Structure formats: structure tokens, C-alpha cells
Amino acid sequence: MAQIQFSRGVAEPVIPDVRLTRSRSGQSGTATFYFREPSIFNSESTDEVTGMYLVDEEGEITTTEVKGKFINGKATDIEAILIMRSPEEWDRFMRFMERYAKEQGLEFSQAGQS
């Protein structure tokens, strides 16, 4: 099962908006995730954000570049950035996203496609 987690072992049910960029050479890329009101910020949650973990049957992709957005002193949103430094890392990320999208009933579309 493909999951996104902010605290190890705790799946985040909120589906993010994901923006991808890739270098012209294809050697590197960036995925920026935006989570609006993620469940980890619920008042019942005592879990701490320790990073963003993309977990599936192949293993785990991790980033610690995770920022919270605060309004009136209350955490509301999360932005996480995953940098891929090789074509292999990009391919691995895309395999995760295909699994995640399929399980969540989402579709992937590239910019410029109709």
C-alpha cells in the first residue's frame, strides 16, 4: 500500500496537490507537495512531524524539507519538497506516485496534455 506519512507509521489521509519540475537534461527534478489542513495537525493527534515519508512495497522515499504554514498561531498547511538528483530517483518517485494515485483514485497528467 502506497502511503504518505509525516510521522513514521502514521498514514496521512489528506491528498496533496503535487507539482513536478524536471531539469532539461532529465538528471534532476523536484516534487513540491501541498497539504491543506493535514490530519497530523488535528487536536487529537499527538504525533510530531519528523519529515515526509513516501512508503510503498519498494521501500521508503524520505525528505526532511517540510514546512508548516501558520494562521493566527495555528498550523494549517504543510509544504514538503523532495529533490531527486538522478534519473533513477525520478523513476522511483514516479513509480510511487503511480501506485499512490491508483490507490487514491487519482489521475496523473503532464503539463500541456489535454
Swiss-Prot record:
The keyword Thylakoid applies. Keywords: Membrane, Photosynthesis, Photosystem II, Thylakoid. The keyword Cytoplasm does not apply. It is found in: Cellular thylakoid membrane. Pfam families: Psb28. It is a peripheral membrane protein. It comes from the Bacteria. Part of the photosystem II complex. Belongs to the Psb28 family. This is Photosystem II reaction center Psb28 protein.
